[in-house]
A protein has these predicted regions:
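Non-heme Fe(II)/2-oxoglutarate
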Residues: 1-98
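Short catalytic/ligand-binding loop motif for oxyanion handling, primarily in non-cytosolic enzymes
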Residues: 22-24, 105-107, 120-123, 143, ...
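A short glycine-rich, His/Asp/Glu-containing loop-to-beta-strand
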Residues: 100-115
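A structural signal for short, well-ordered beta-strand segments
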Residues: 111-113, 133-135, 195-199
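Conserved short histidine dyad/triad with adjacent acidic residue
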Residues: 112-127
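Catalytic core of Fe(II)/2-oxoglutarate
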Residues: 129, 140-206
Length: 206
């Protein structure tokens, strides 16, 4: 795990090699299980896709909030291994010296699996949470271009790299540029996956 700390207009973290080989094996087992149209569905306003000022849908991808699929978190490989973000009193988040990451705690979190294929993208939006942690995954060799994330109105580019995690305050505007699949091999499952963890504070539980 290689952690890079950034503290420009706002604090954020980029972590490469976030999951180890065994964790990746478990994650891919579940991603392959989920990668069917009746499981990962096209984003809609009703399913939580962000909208613009005029009500237009900003999100063009397939997605699913997987917490609602399982009665018990332990039944999901992804929901089991992604607990590492909160382990040891938020040890990973505490690597950043900024007061935001030094003090943040959650009493609620939820996880979304997203999948981007040809021409998919996500317009600039903010997340309805406190902290967003996005992990990008794709099958090697990479068979698409694009899918990079841009932070804030200054468009700070974070390249889409396999097994890279980006962690940032959820209120920071961000977007994903358009995916272009390799036309010679456009088969489903070879696009850009993203596992997004949202850490939130539910005041009703305080």
């Amino acid at each position: 795990m290689i952690i890079d700390i950034f503290n420009e207009q706002f604090p954020y973290m980029v972590i490469d090699d976030y999951y180890n080989e065994e964790e990746l094996r478990l994650i891919w087992e579940e991603l392959d299980f989920l990668s069917y149209p009746h499981k990962l569905k096209r984003a809609t306003k009703e399913s939580g896709g962000a909208t613009g000022n005029t009500g237009e849908l900003l999100k063009k991808n397939f997605h699913r909030y997987i917490d609602e699929i399982y009665c018990e978190r332990e039944m999901s490989n992804i929901l089991s291994v992604n607990r590492k973000l909160f382990s040891n009193d938020y040890e990973i988040l505490r690597q950043h010296p900024h007061w935001f990451f030094q003090n943040i705690k959650f009493n609620r979190d939820y996880t979304q699996v997203g999948y981007y294929e040809d021409n998919d993208h996500y317009g600039e939006h903010r997340d309805n949470a406190s902290v967003s942690a996005l992990t990008w995954l794709y099958k090697e060799p990479k068979k698409f271009t694009g899918g990079d994330l841009f932070l804030s109105s200054d468009k700070i580019k974070i390249d889409c790299v396999n097994n890279r995690t980006l962690i940032f305050p959820s209120m920071i505007p961000h977007s994903v540029n358009e995916i272009h699949m390799n036309k010679e091999n456009p088969s489903r499952g070879h696009g850009r996956y993203v596992i997004t963890q949202f850490g939130a504070i539910d005041t009703r539980k305080s």
